[in-house]
Design a protein with these regions (language model features):
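N-terminal membrane-targeting hydrophobic helices
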Residues: 1-181
Length: 181
């Protein structure tokens, strides 16, 4: 999978998180920061960190490892940022969902390996391969026809989800404006 699919899903969760903020339209820089944070969270298991195991889809794609990290981050956020808009339960839940969406999306790809979602408890791999989803070939240029095809398929598959979340976010803001009027 490419970062495009993960990023589009991260933006989808960011739009929903921002719809819960009362003054989201008045804080453009904050909104950009939230969007970038959610995109980073959605791509986090693929970050090239030492001993992270991304190339094997084990440590970095384990539900146990990621859930433990998410719980740690939430505990820190709740402790250090008590009362701030970004420490609210709905915002933190959407951030966690953006992070965990990575595991589900990677299981859709047709590389045949699956992901070791239950590592270290089990060596079983989750493989929900969808035939038209494939990985990009890093040995080829990013602009090669095969890689552009992978990007295009991801764009077509995940953009409707982003558009749907933007529509839901718009409706939430409109209802809030009507309730306040």
């Amino acid at each position: 999978m490419t970062p495009m699919g993960h990023s589009l899903i991260g933006l989808s969760f960011a739009s929903l998180a921002l719809s819960t903020s009362k003054n989201a339209t008045n804080h453009r820089w904050r909104n950009c920061g939230v969007a970038l944070t959610f995109v980073a969270l959605a791509n986090l298991p693929d970050w090239p960190l030492p001993n992270w195991g991304h190339d094997r889809y084990d440590v970095s794609h384990s539900i146990f490892v990621n859930a433990g990290l998410i719980c740690t981050v939430i505990a820190v956020m709740k402790t250090l940022a008590t009362g701030k808009w970004f420490s609210q339960p709905r915002f933190l839940m959407l951030a966690a969902m953006a992070w965990l969406s990575h595991l589900l999306l990677d299981s859709f790809y047709n590389h045949g390996n699956g992901i070791a979602i239950y590592w270290p408890v089990s060596s079983q791999r989750l493989n929900l391969a969808i035939p038209w989803f494939s990985n990009w070939d890093l040995s080829q240029p990013v602009t090669s026809p095969d890689n552009l095809s992978v990007f295009g398929i991801e764009f077509l598959a995940y953009t409707p989800i982003l558009l749907g979340s933007l529509l839901v976010s718009y409706e939430i803001r409109n209802r809030r404006a009507l309730d306040e009027a």
